[in-house]
Amino acid sequence: MLIRKFRGVMLFSLLLGSANLLHAAELLKPFVLASTGTGEIVATVTEVKTKLASAGFELAGEYSPYDNVSILIVTSDALKAAAAKSDFGGYAAGQRVSVTKVGDEVQVAYTNPVYMAHAYRMNAKLQTTADKLKAALGSMKQYGPAEGLEADAVRKYHYMFGMEYFDEPSLLAEYKSYDEAVAVVEKSLAAKKGGASKVYRIDVPGKDEAVFGVHLTKDCSGDKFVMGHIDFKPVRSTAHLPYEMLVSGKKVYALYARFRIAINFPDLKMMGDNSFFKIMCAPDEIEEALMFAAGGKKVEDEDDF
């Protein structure tokens, strides 16, 4: 009898240990490939918009930063509510959906809400949003880096020693009030200061916070330049774009490129072809462009990648 009980306890312990190992082994990647097929960008975008609207998503903005791509930014009451409960949660108030033509193949993809929830240290997992996107658009696989990251690693991510974490943003400008900060950003983006223009704006309910998605076009800060060097794999990571500016209270912030790019391309090499070295000029140029877009002035920064 005692031996039988002991065997039962051992079996239960082994099963529990296996379950824990499976749970611990769950790995996340920044993007989800929804579908692939043939056709044209315009028709596919129209179809995707219809599916997203039927699933309850609101289109916050869209743009085509370079040929053969279209990017949609969607939000929902659930996303905005989750953003309101998290410090700097506005970064995740919109999820990005991309339609990319690579050769004869049209790829539909979107940001992985669960990955982004950890990347932006949200107080919500955004699993419901992930489920709704999957139901609306499909889910063939997560993708991005060759190897995924555990949730805790995403939440604490930085590319390497000396590079910024999520909670070390760039302060672009500061004003006397939230209303003034938002007004200046709107005006500066309309004037395309720094080569930046507005793609979308999402206001976070119940707090003085708004996130702006911006199209960057100037020199080394440009979307086309950066992606031309780092987005080279067969399945494109187009939904990395657009870059964000966050107005929170009286201040205007942006995530440093050394974090914002790396969190979506964590396995990008430091040197060689298709590496951070090829966009060495980008971090400072992006920060400068966003400072102008925030109504601020250029500051010198001695650091690059």
Which sequence ranges carry the predicted segments?
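Bacterial N-terminal signal peptides
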Residues: 9-19
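Terminal, regulation- and interaction-focused segments at domain boundaries
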Residues: 25-66, 120, 141-211
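Sec/Tat signal peptide C-region and signal peptidase I cleavage site
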Residues: 20-24
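Hydrophobic alpha-helical segments and helix pairs
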Residues: 108-149
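A cross-kingdom marker for long, charged
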Residues: 209-305
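Compact, glycine-rich, soluble single-domain proteins
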Residues: 74, 83-88, 203-216
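Bacterial N-terminal signal peptides that target proteins for export
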Residues: 1-10
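Mid-chain, structured segments of secreted extracytoplasmic proteins
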Residues: 70-112
